[in-house]
Swiss-Prot record:
Residues annotated to bind GTP: 148-151, 200-208
Cofactor note as given: Binds 1 zinc ion per subunit.
Phylogenetic lineage: Bacteria, Bacillati, Bacillota, Bacilli, Bacillales
This protein's name: Small ribosomal subunit biogenesis GTPase RsgA 1
SUPFAM superfamilies: P-loop containing nucleoside triphosphate hydrolases (SSF52540)
Keyword line: Cytoplasm, GTP-binding, Hydrolase, Metal-binding, Nucleotide-binding, Ribosome biogenesis, RNA-binding, rRNA-binding, Zinc
Native source organism of the sequence: Oceanobacillus iheyensis (strain DSM 14371 / CIP 107618 / JCM 11309 / KCTC 3954 / HTE831)
Gene3D superfamilies noted in UniProt: P-loop containing nucleotide triphosphate hydrolases, Probable gtpase engc, domain 3
Length: 351
């Protein structure tokens, strides 16, 4: 495989901006408990991170993730290559880790499009979709929505209508696994320089869709429990695949929950652009949308132009992001103190 073939096959983009030795460039295609499989110009290689990277890592974001482009050390260790550096990411799907810890988990990096896979055989959970869209817009990638199991939907037109009222022009696809109807529409929107990740709940059909797009069964698929419609986890790790039509696609384990993560204060602006527009029309710039006169938000709620459930969802996500930001700031301050304490102790040793 020459340089052009390697870069084209693994959706290398100019944003990566690497000008070093090409045989030291690799893309992470699989991650399992700090063990990695990389695609290099010379084929697949097992890998680990170098000790210095592990020692200096402050959070999980400092470790490689599926989709990352990495630079290798020149010498390997018993045929295991050593990851020396993670190149800057131009996008990343990030969520807060489950539980009380304020830590980020990278679902996939350097992706151009995110396909949110939703099962059409049950009622559309609008609040969950808003949460997914918020995470995708925050990532720097563009969101797409795929409705799976459309042959089992009781009212597909209603589902599309509801989704469109939230998605505001985001591409929507209908996918039928029994006859693969809709597959060509999806492939037509994945280009050779695209890196696409699929996210969604367990049992939504992500692995089945990837098998269809790859034209071969590379992923195990599972059934859905009839009592609660929850899928069984068939994908246990993240993995990147080449599409025969060009581009790469990343499978991810099903998500029971998606807790948001933020890097700035403008996270909700895309998902709730309608609410942002209303807020801009309020008489007072610091309107709390409570007792103030000439409040466009209150007026829209009263007339029904703004659904109360959507407004409450906006407020809930706003509170969640504010809480995470406060915790992040506290954590950063603690880490900064630890770092300088460590530097001070090292300086004393060197005297």
């Amino acid at each position: 495989m020459n340089l052009n073939e390697f870069q084209q096959k693994y959706a290398y983009r100019k944003e990566i901006n690497y000008d070093g030795q090409i045989d030291l460039l690799a893309r992470v295609v699989m991650e399992q408990k700090e063990r990695y499989i990389l695609q290099t110009i010379n084929g697949f290689k097992p890998a680990v991170v170098k000790g210095k990277m592990r020692h200096e890592a402050i959070s999980r974001e400092d470790y490689p993730a599926v989709g990352d482009w990495v630079v290798l050390q020149e010498k390997d260790f018993n045929d295991i290559v050593i990851i020396d550096q993670v190149l800057p990411r131009f996008s990343s799907i990030v969520r807060k880790v489950a539980g009380l810890r304020t830590d980020a988990q990278i679902v996939a990096s350097n992706v151009t499009k995110v396909f949110i896979v939703i099962s059409a055989d049950e009622d559309l959970n609008e609040r969950k979709l808003e949460r997914y869209l918020t995470a995708v817009w925050e990532s720097g990638a563009s969101p797409h929505i795929v409705f799976s199991k459309v042959d089992l939907a009781s009212d597909m037109d209603s589902i599309i209508e509801h989704a469109d009222s939230i998605a505001f022009g985001i591409p929507l696809y209908k996918w039928n696994a029994t006859n693969e109807e809709g597959k060509e529409d999806i492939l037509a929107n994945i280009h050779e320089d695209d890196s696409v990740v699929l996210i969604g709940s367990s049992g939504a059909g992500k692995s089945t869709l990837i098998n269809a797009l790859l034209t071969e069964k590379v992923l195990k698929t599972g059934s859905v429990r009839e009592d609660d419609k929850r899928g069984r986890h068939t994908t246990t790790h993240r993995e990147l695949f080449n599409l025969p039509t060009g581009g790469v696609i990343i499978d991810t384990p099903g998500m029971r929950e998606l807790q948001l993560w933020t890097e700035d204060g403008d996270t909700l602006s895309h998902t709730f652009s309608d609410i942002n527009h209303l807020i801009a029309e309020c008489k007072f710039t610091d309107c709390k949308h409570d007792t103030e006169p000439d409040c466009a938000v209150k007026e829209a709620l009263e007339t029904g132009d703004l659904e109360e459930g959507r407004w409450n969802s906006y407020l809930k996500l706003q509170r969640e992001l504010a809480y995470i930001e406060r915790k992040q700031n506290a954590k950063l301050a603690t880490e900064e103190r630890k770092k300088w304490k460590k530097i001070s102790m090292q300086q004393k040793k060197n005297r």
